[in-house]
UniProtKB/Swiss-Prot annotation:
It comes from Beta vulgaris. Residues 64-84 are annotated as: Disordered. This is Acidic endochitinase SP2. Residues 67-78 are annotated as: 4 X 3 AA tandem repeats of T-T-P. The keyword Repeat applies.
Length: 288
């Protein structure tokens, strides 16, 4: 057999072996062909392990909704960050009850808000991307703001919201058109407001925010999910700047730079209390 023939046969054999590899072994950085899905573990392929809901981060995912890519690790409690404590460990039933227990029996939120609904709404990155102290501070900040906004989870809707402003931003109405007869005043734990926030929250968590804004006040799971959406979209990324930055992200136009200091200080006092409950220092830059 000639050397040329041998080389040709070896090349053919190599190509044959490579071609027989499953498609899932290629493109670990997800440079997949258009017809292949990229799994959460960074492999290309087809079928439920690659394209299924919860398994797919890009490509023709089933349901059309890619998930956030994950890295294979030793299984841990969901929501556990670098410090080893999960959100559910930190937000115990006793902690939650300690907040809502301060609300009067006549408060509408008393029989609406639940710890279970909060936990079901928790984003995987919430209280889960920093040190143990960082994670506890974020959770303390979240509950400080919802305690302020709802007066210890007493209120579901903005007081007198149904007779007040419609919160329809006309500058954004072309993109987020306000529905006839609907008002986009504060609802839920973070008092979600304005037509554009309702629209975007609805798109993110799956409800008609413009046509049915009332759902944030009637369905507790939607209520907490809308609050978590707002937090992760607008607040989560500034936690490393201190609590003051979170106030600025939520209501900076009215409570920063010396404005409405009683309101801003109320948030700070809640934050300090919850940090103390979690055994963590509140850190610097508490004001905005």
């Amino acid at each position: 057999m000639t050397l040329l023939l041998k080389n040709t046969l070896y090349l053919a054999l190599i190509i044959s072996v490579i071609s027989s590899f499953p498609t899932s072994l290629f493109a670990q950085n997800c440079g997949c062909a258009p017809n292949l899905c990229c799994s959460n573990f960074g492999f290309c392929g087809t079928g439920t392990p690659y394209c299924g809901v919860g398994n797919c981060q890009s490509g023709p995912c089933e349901g059309g909704t890619p998930t956030t890519p994950t890295t294979p690790t030793t299984p841990t409690t969901p929501g556990t960050g670098g410090g080893g404590s999960s959100v559910s460990d930190i937000v115990s039933q006793a902690f939650f009850d300690g907040i809502i227990g301060q609300a009067a029996a006549s408060c509408p939120g008393k029989n609406f808000y639940t710890r279970a609904a909060f936990l079901s709404a928790v984003d995987p990155k919430f209280g889960n991307e920093g040190s143990s102290d960082d994670n506890k501070r974020e959770i303390a900040a979240f509950f400080a703001h919802i305690s302020h906004e709802t007066t210890n989870l007493c209120h579901i809707e903005e007081r007198d919201g149904d007779v007040g402003d419609a919160y329809c931003d006309q500058d954004k109405a072309a993109q987020y058109p306000c529905a006839a007869g609907k008002k986009y005043y504060g609802r839920g734990p973070l008092q979600l407001s304005w037509n554009y926030n309702y629209a975007l929250a609805g798109q993110a968590i799956g409800f008609d925010g413009l046509g049915n804004p009332e759902k944030v006040a009637t369905d507790v799971n939607t209520s907490f999910k809308a609050a978590m959406w707002f937090w992760m979209t607008n607040v989560h990324s500034v936690m490393n700047q201190g609590f003051g930055a979170t106030t600025k992200a939520i209501n900076g136009a009215l409570e920063c730079n010396g404005q409405n200091q009683d309101q801003a200080n109320d948030r700070i006092q809640f934050y300090k209390k919850y940090c103390a409950d979690f055994g963590v220092a509140p850190g610097d830059n508490l004001t905005c």
